[in-house]
Amino acid sequence: MFTDRKANSLKAKRQQQPWPKGKPFKILSLDGGGIKGIYTAHLLRQCEQNLADGKPLASYFDMIAGTSTGGIIALGLGLGRTTEEIVSFYETDGRRIFPPYPASLLGKAWRFVTSFFRPLLNHEELEAALKRRFEDDTLGQAGPRIVVPAFMMPKTEIAVF
């Protein structure tokens, strides 16, 4: 999953999936918000439990898209993780990946100013946690289509995975 994006280009690796015929195309869209993704994860877990048919939540969708923390959840669902595993990810790794917001006005101002020059998150902690959870999984192994837009720092380049 963590390879050179240029060498592993989307056009070279993308596999066409059939368009569902005779039924609506269902998309689950998940927004960002850092550690607040734990709320989304809990809500999705409740939805999966309420369905009570034993099927994973991802099997109900043709595409799962997510930005930022929503992208992490989209990857988890698309690569076959249960909603319980996704909740566990946030409970176990969330505090290391998503630093707390500063309480003081000066701290908030500093965070705002520095956000223009560097990422708000510690990418090493995020990458280590994702490697632990996804190991050698690839997007090609996903059940539904997965869409995760990203902003590549410091090149200010947009990428869609």
Where are these regions (language model features)?
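Non-catalytic, mobile gating and regulatory segments of ester bond hydrolases
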Residues: 1-18, 24-25, 62, 86-87, ...
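A generic N-terminal leader/anchor concept
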Residues: 18-19, 50
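Short, well-ordered loop/turn elements at secondary-structure boundaries
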Residues: 22-24, 58-60, 142-144, 155
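Patatin-like phospholipase
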Residues: 24-29, 35-130, 160
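Active-site gating loop/helix substructures
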Residues: 35, 141-161
